[in-house]
Amino acid sequence: MNRKIRASDRKIIPPQCEMPKMTYSKIQNILPGLGLSVAITAAAMVLEKIEEHYAGRAWLEALVIAILLGTAVRSLARPGPRFNKGINFSAKLLLEIAVVLLGASISASAVIEAGSGLIFGIAAVVAVAITLSYGIGRLLKLPHRMAVLVACGNSICGNSAIAAMAPVIGAESEDVAASIAFTAILGVIVVLTLPLLVPLLGLSFTQYGILAGLTVYAVPQVLAATAPVSLLSVQLGTLVKLVRVLMLGPVILVFALISGNKNADVKPGFFQLVPWFIIGFLAMMALHSLHLIPEAILPAIQYASMLLTIISMAALGLGVDIRSVASAGGRVTLTAILSLIALCCISLGLIHMLGVA
């Protein structure tokens, strides 16, 4: 019965994205990493206050400081394995909860005001970006499956898109690992540098929110990229990003049809195509739109969302291994960077075409 496992047999079984259940033993396991993330968050918030006191304003927000401090701790101190579960918990689940809470500050009227033109424009941006990114990858001699993973990761929702697409196209574990490794690094770089485009390009808060929603990899990372700019940017960026994430289902269906379902022996479940926190976000937005959330508690909900986001950014920094850039390979790196630049240009073109002020 034993047989040699071929490379083509090493296919990725996508993880389920339902909200995980917590037990006492799991809580014990996450405490070291969670405590470290909270400590870095506290330090980041103190440094932000020091900035405000001596410089008159916070040039680096606590969100950004938390990422930088977390990355520095990971690079210099290298926390041991016992911190990993808590770091992963903080970087993923806490950030997803922050997204859910953010829904309480957004009304459905904002979606209606966005208009059908923007919604169809987002779908067009995703389609064009995937095509261009795949073309760039193939021109740089990336294998077909690797090019698809990078294209979908860049154009839709980063690691989630990569994990969902992998079983559909029969991707090997090495391809998935390389794609995810560099996407994690590039995602942090985008969060840190994208706000610089506001003064550089003279973008309004509305324009920047749409740009962030169209270019930042993950829904939670949109919070980190837009929070230093304005609340309006946060709200618009999140809405645009949610629409972009919902493109994952149709895109996976298209690739499954193209591949003739030969490799789709493991089909992504509902919660992989539509993560639980997006459903939670929409539910909170509906409650807010129906005036079922008391106005008096909205500031507390918004503060909790912001605080959880900072903790998650600290954990995100703790999970960044700069050496992953080298291990990802030069062609993957160049493909991802060129694809991101193309995505930014396409997004700015859409903003200009729609006449967004």
From Swiss-Prot:
Gene Ontology cellular-component terms listed: plasma membrane
Subcellular location(s) per record: Cell membrane
Name the UniProt record assigns to this protein: UPF0324 membrane protein BMEI1914
Alphabetical list of PANTHER family matching this protein: INNER MEMBRANE PROTEIN YEIH-RELATED, UPF0324 INNER MEMBRANE PROTEIN YEIH
UniProt family annotation: Belongs to the UPF0324 family.
TM stretches of this protein: 29-48, 58-77, 90-112, 117-136, 149-171, 181-203, 210-232, 242-261, 268-290, 300-322, 334-356
Bilayer disposition of the protein: Multi-pass membrane protein
Entry keyword set: Cell membrane, Membrane, Transmembrane, Transmembrane helix
Organism for this UniProt entry: Brucella melitensis biotype 1 (strain ATCC 23456 / CCUG 17765 / NCTC 10094 / 16M)
Highest taxon of source: Bacteria
